[in-house]
């Protein structure tokens, strides 16, 4: 017997639009251009999903002296990542696309590697988070230029606004990672 995929289908008769297709949009954006933009936004969405889950994991596993202060930041940062994800997913839909969701779509568009499921020290975890923020910030910058070049200034503005949020959170992570900010393991031994 063949293995069934881990997807739950409601039946083909209930599908309004298939994943990876572009329908009409009311924004006046040509379908081919909308397809390019949706593909780019799905890259961002995939990275946001991965980084959100990674930041939440690091929040859950915090312990020690940094728990309260750093925990508050990571929890709020995850919320901001979720808000950015929602804003971009709504834009994908407005452009006539279906936002990336689920492991297969995320893997297809992933600009980040998924962190192994281990519990790492705080410094290593934050370095990994900062790397994810840097990767996404670079992707957002590239896509701002691209979408504005093809005439979608509204998506460009959305990406610019959300880029500022990513950069602000990355700056906070940089401060936590400053030489003497975090307790080092050898100091506890």
Where in the sequence are the language-model features?
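Short, solvent-exposed positions on alpha-helices
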Residues: 53, 68, 72, 153-157
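Conserved alpha-helical segments that form or flank metal/cofactor-binding pockets of metalloenzymes
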Residues: 56, 62-105, 176
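Generic structural signal for well-ordered, non-transmembrane alpha-helical segments
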Residues: 42, 46-49, 75-86, 127, ...
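Long, contiguous binding/interaction regions
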Residues: 2-3, 99, 103-107, 134-135, ...
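Acidic/histidine-rich alpha-helical segments that form the ligand environment
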Residues: 40-41, 58, 90-91, 104-164
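Short, contiguous alpha-helical
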Residues: 156-188
